[in-house]
Amino acid sequence: MDNADHIIEGRLVPSAPDARIVVRDPSTGEAFTEIGRGGQAEIDQAVASARAALGGEWGGLSAYERGRRLLSMAKLLRDNIDTMTALEVRDVGKPVAQSRADVVACARYFEFYGEAADKLGSETIPFQNGYTVLTKREPHGVTGHIIPWNYPMQIIGRSVGAALAMGNA
């Protein structure tokens, strides 16, 4: 596998040469790639990019359009299931069948939230005589996600899929 860096604003952003993490297959101990170690500069750049997206194209998408994008992500995962499974096996050290199930679960989360994106809206709740309460769902804004090493595919689907479906960046 090629070494990986950060993807910020749709572009590869390299880490400093001394800010690299060697990734090892936990079942063999074999190093198979290096990834960039993000620091404050990369975090600040990613947050600024996400804020700009909220004020730009992403923030202007309808819930339906966001949902379609999540469904596209699910399709990409399914179309590349063998590659994603092999990566998950090496990265996490799980057996092939379990890693494949995790990729499928990630795709299913993106499908679920993609299909739910335009179904969750405001509610009108009866209150007192002659009064109602209106609730309105709004995105929180920029969200950060901590992904554990042992279930990365499932947690990415579960947390990132939900956040994006609701309009967060």
Language-model-detected regions and their locations in the chain:
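Short glycine/serine/threonine-biased micro-segments
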Residues: 8, 34, 91, 139, ...
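Short glycine- and Lys/Arg-enriched binding-loop motifs that mark or flank ligand-binding interfaces
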Residues: 6, 89, 118, 126, ...
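Hydrophobic face of amphipathic alpha-helices that form TPR/SEL1-like repeat modules
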Residues: 1-28
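Short connector loops/turns at beta-strand edges and beta->alpha or beta->beta junctions
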Residues: 26-28, 40, 161-163
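Conserved small-residue-rich beta-alpha loop and adjacent elements
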Residues: 123-169
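Glycine-rich loop-to-alpha-helix module at the N-terminal edge of alpha/beta enzyme cores
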Residues: 32-120
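Residue-level signature of catalytic and energy-coupling elements of molecular machines
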Residues: 10, 29, 66, 110, ...
